């Protein structure tokens, strides 16, 4: 499991996982869009071999 800490978030958008088929097989992606307090936009893309690996737990 990988942990990503994001601080000073103004807006957080977590998309549902989507599957993609490539020449090497099926894989899953999930995008996270973050806008911080200074209006800086960051896009994070996660890749995995199965949908369960892309589970996200929000800690508040």
Locations of the language-model features?
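N-terminal acidic leader/helix
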Residues: 1-29
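Short, charge-rich amphipathic interface segments used for partner binding and complex assembly
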Residues: 21-60
